Amino acid sequence: MSVYLSRRTMIQTAGLAALAGPMSGAGTPEPRFEGKDTPKICLATGDAGGGFGSGGRGGAPGGAAAQSAGAAPAGNQPPAQNPPAGAAPGTPALSPQEANARRIKQLGVNYVLSGGPRIPWDETALKTMMDTQKSYGLTLGNLMIQGFNNAIYGHQGRDEEIDRVIQSIHAVGKVGLPVVEYNWYAHRATEGYFEEFDDVRTGAGWTGFDYELVHTPGRAYMARLSDAESTMKFKDLPPLANEGAHTLDEMWATITYFLKRVIPEAEKAGVRLALHPNDPPAPVSRGSQQIMSSVEGWKHLIEIVRSPANGITFDCGVTREMGHNPVEVAAYFASRDRINHVHFRNVRVKKPYERYSEVFIDEGENNMFAVMKELVKHKYTRLIYPEHPRALDYDRERGRIGGYPGGGGYASFAFQVGYTRAMLQAALAS
């Protein structure tokens, strides 16, 4: 077939070629990926569609200290397909755990975090966990520790619980796990969560929080209320009998006692602790004040025992929920080497501490690129978790529903990871 090019077409083609400049690759650096000297994107071991099991990141709804802040409970997750639909010929049948790992790896994610087993942790069991993930091509970089409510509340038996925490941390150090994350709640304010819908994105789900929320009959909520409480605003809910009410002074006293025993042992073990903020950062939660619901509280925490082992989980979403600029807050803690883990998400705030919406990572008030640049600037090299995916029909139709109202599943995590990687690559190149 003959092709006719007019003189004008030839001139236009030549001009476009000149504007295009050198061919791709001539002097243009390739984007950088996660490495030893960069932040590392991670997911929880249960984030890829299967059940969480013992290796997930979820926590029981309701009682304070047993919950894993920042990571949704398992929700309703589908079983793995054996072999995965559309997989290459010869792909073997997979266990649910193998299928999860395969999906995580397909997003280019090589690091995972998980909830830990019952304390005290055993070196052999931890090594098995790490070796299992390694066999999937994944590195376990963070475990959530819990099971020390007496230490949190200052009750009898706290010394025995702290002994078990210390034993667990030494086991972690022996297997080379770098970070242990934990919470310090008198009560986690999950009763204030509800689902909102993004009208612009045609019904995608957000997670709303309202300090004055009254539960509406017939709607699903993360926490169940008694009949007597069902007409009360969240802020007026009474303390639970097994938790009691606690002041800031009481909570600071219990965590100070904990840190002065635990941090020296963490230093010996070569392990960093990361305390997650109180999320939601409500001023009072069922009668108890919250020590990690303010930036001032975060700053006080790292001064109790001055050590890189005594750090925080920097959550830019919670930072904004409290009305602060996460870029400035990241700079404060990163410059002091006190960020031991990062949660990366976005929100819109109507009233700091009391009324906000957890939205898609690309549409909130946070400048996520500026946050990432600040982390890179201060040479943060540990994990970044793009948590709290939003609800999408694709996940809803497949039963992949996050444990938070308005939370999503694997498809939404793919969006979170892709956006986070774009921010990271741009920050590394800037």
Model feature map: region roles:
Residues 115-256, 268, 318, 381-382:
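Structural motif corresponding to the early beta-alpha repeats
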Residues 51-53, 90-104, 162-169, 325-331:
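Short, acidic/polar
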Residues 2-15, 19-25, 29-40, 45-85, ...:
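Histidine-acidic metal/acid-base catalytic patches
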